[in-house]
Amino acid sequence: MPIGVPKVPFRNPGEEDAVWVDVYNRLHRERLLFLGQEVDSEISNQIVGLMVYLSIEDDTRDLYLFINSPGGWVIPGIAIYDTMQFVLPDVHTICMGLAASMGSFILVGGEITKRLAFPHARVMIHQPASSFYEAQARDFILEAEELLKLRETLTKVYVQRTGNPLWVISEDMERDVFMSATEAQAHGIVDLVAIENENTGNSI
């Protein structure tokens, strides 16, 4: 039997009685957002909508986007990235577990100096791919041209936001490049790596 989303009590300001809301609803009220699945149109629209709403609600408080994603569709990922640059609050990105493919693209899109990885997180970058075998010859050519444009877009963003030269990013995107948290920091994808407290096991 699947476990449902846990519910937690929440009291609106000025109200005496608390109401029960699901835990993600509660976290969203604290401006904490989660990308914990493949990137597709549904989750992209949810995150974009939340960022826009929370920006309208209060454009002075930062947003925090936690990422544990194997990647996914390019265009929905770009939609999240563009919205992060559009909203007025700074968006912190936090990698926990894995930020691969479009997950790493969204990770690097956080406010520079406010991108963090947990100590055992993994990051992977590569070029966009497509299922060419499903396409007819004409569609194959058109799709290949579109992929080249998307690759150019992603490469430019990585260059801009990591500080690496174009040739370094271009070489990295030729294959799957996995990195530890510290390697991702050295590569400019994140700015900080959380430090584990040796006494308590908690991260600080």
Swiss-Prot record:
PROSITE patterns reported for this sequence:
CLP_PROTEASE_HIS, CLP_PROTEASE_SER
The record's section on HAMAP family has: ClpP
Please describe the quaternary structure of this protein: Component of the chloroplastic Clp protease core complex.
Q: What broad class describes the main subcellular location of this protein?
A: plastid
Report the protein's function.
Cleaves peptides in various proteins in a process that requires ATP hydrolysis. Has a chymotrypsin-like activity. Plays a major role in the degradation of misfolded proteins.
- Kindly list the places in or outside the cell where this protein is found, as annotated in its UniProt entry: Plastid, Chloroplast stroma
UniProt entry tagged with the keyword NADP = no
Q: One of this protein's GO BP terms? A: protein quality control for misfolded or incompletely synthesized proteins
For this entry, the protein name equals ATP-dependent Clp protease proteolytic subunit
Q: Which family does it belong to?
A: Belongs to the peptidase S14 family.
Cellular component terms per the entry's GO annotation: chloroplast stroma; endopeptidase Clp complex
Q: Which InterPro entries does its entry note?
A: ClpP, ClpP/crotonase-like_dom_sf, ClpP/TepA, ClpP_His_AS, ClpP_Ser_AS
Q: Which residues form the active site?
A: S101, H126
A single GO molecular-function term is: ATPase binding
> For this protein, what is the EC number?
3.4.21.92
Q: Which UniProt keywords apply?
A: Chloroplast, Hydrolase, Plastid, Protease, Serine protease
What gene name does this entry carry?
clpP
**Which superkingdom?**
Eukaryota
Catalytic reaction list: Hydrolysis of proteins to small peptides in the presence of ATP and magnesium. alpha-casein is the usual test substrate. In the absence of ATP, only oligopeptides shorter than five residues are hydrolyzed (such as succinyl-Leu-Tyr-|-NHMec, and Leu-Tyr-Leu-|-Tyr-Trp, in which cleavage of the -Tyr-|-Leu- and -Tyr-|-Trp bonds also occurs)
